């Protein structure tokens, strides 16, 4: 009797664990569900009880199927099951290279574990994801006519995209200005405000760009006229009286407080702190609302005096020395 129990009990324990019915898990990162010329897709598989036996990924369209990935995993013995409990595949899907045309398709995923269910074939999990293959770039149609911009000035362009886009707007040299829908009833019509830097001349390339949900990108020029502008040149005299009065308020900046002289404090504020401020304003401007939050032109405060102009080119003199040059923004 003891011998029977010694044999039956371990077998029962093994059967209990090896015949478990918990199916493996599949997680797919596929946002948005559109495949362009090339798309990176991450697929994660897990089976904490019996371990992963095999994974398979295929792409099906119009009755044609191509295997995108297939992988078998090692067995670690009757007690443990599979040697691998979790794994992930990084897939690069390129439809055209595999002979697929644009249109609706199905991504299929399957994973099996090392359980003894289904006549030792294991538990299986199967997942389908409907995707849209789109390898064509969006087309752009400019609706506005006048796009005249001076150096340091701004302009606006109204345009239509042929399909929903992840991003669209105006590229001015190295600067990108996003466009947004919502200003017009037609959701395909977008409005983009853009600017020409004070240091960007009439030869600066200005292009309309769009990237659709599949990552396909298009760009096109549009009629525009860029005007050169001469900015005011100004020389400012920096005195000890001014430095002793103004600089202490900047001692909250560690670099300024550590400076050895008032003149050095001024140079740090006028250069490094100024550049940090420009960078902060640029970062804030990257996250714009998709609506116009003002009405009419921007005006100077009533009864206020004009102290400086945009992009004034300033020379700073201390005694008989030129100590700095900056552009006032």
Predicted regions and their residues:
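Surface-exposed loop/turn and intrinsically disordered segments
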Residues: 1-188, 193-201, 206-232
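C-terminal soluble interaction/assembly domains
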Residues: 324-329
């Amino acid at each position: 009797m003891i011998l029977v129990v010694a044999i039956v009990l371990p077998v029962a324990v093994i059967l209990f664990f090896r015949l478990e019915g918990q199916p493996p898990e599949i997680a797919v990162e596929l946002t948005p569900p559109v495949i362009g010329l090339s798309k990176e897709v991450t697929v994660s598989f897990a089976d904490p009880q019996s371990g992963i036996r095999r994974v398979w990924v295929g792409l099906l369209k119009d009755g044609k199927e191509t295997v995108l990935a297939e992988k078998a995993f090692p067995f670690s013995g009757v007690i443990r099951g599979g040697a691998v409990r979790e794994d992930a595949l990084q897939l690069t899907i390129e439809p055209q290279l595999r002979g697929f045309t644009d249109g609706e398709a199905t991504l299929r995923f399957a994973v099996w574990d090392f359980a003894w269910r289904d006549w030792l074939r294991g538990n299986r999990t199967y997942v389908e994801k409907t995707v849209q293959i789109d390898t064509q770039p969006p087309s752009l149609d400019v609706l506005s006519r006048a796009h005249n911009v001076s150096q340091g000035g701004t302009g606006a362009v109204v345009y239509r995209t042929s399909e929903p886009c992840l991003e669209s707007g105006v590229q001015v040299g190295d600067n990108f200005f996003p466009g947004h829908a919502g200003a017009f009833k037609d959701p395909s019509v977008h409005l983009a405000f853009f600017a020409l830097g004070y240091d960007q001349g009439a030869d600066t390339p200005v292009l309309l760009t769009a990237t659709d949900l599949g990552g396909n990108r298009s760009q096109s020029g549009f009629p525009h006229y860029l005007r050169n502008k001469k900015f005011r040149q100004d020389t400012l005299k920096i005195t000890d009286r001014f430095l002793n009065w103004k600089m202490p308020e900047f001692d909250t900046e560690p670099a300024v407080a550590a400076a050895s002289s008032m003149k050095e404090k001024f140079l740090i504020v006028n250069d490094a702190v100024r550049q940090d401020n420009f960078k902060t304003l640029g970062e804030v401007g990257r996250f714009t609302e998709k609506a116009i939050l003002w009405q009419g032109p921007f005006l100077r405060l009533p009864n206020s005096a004009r102290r400086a102009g945009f992009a004034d080119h300033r020379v700073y003199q201390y005694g008989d020395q030129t100590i700095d040059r900056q552009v006032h923004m």
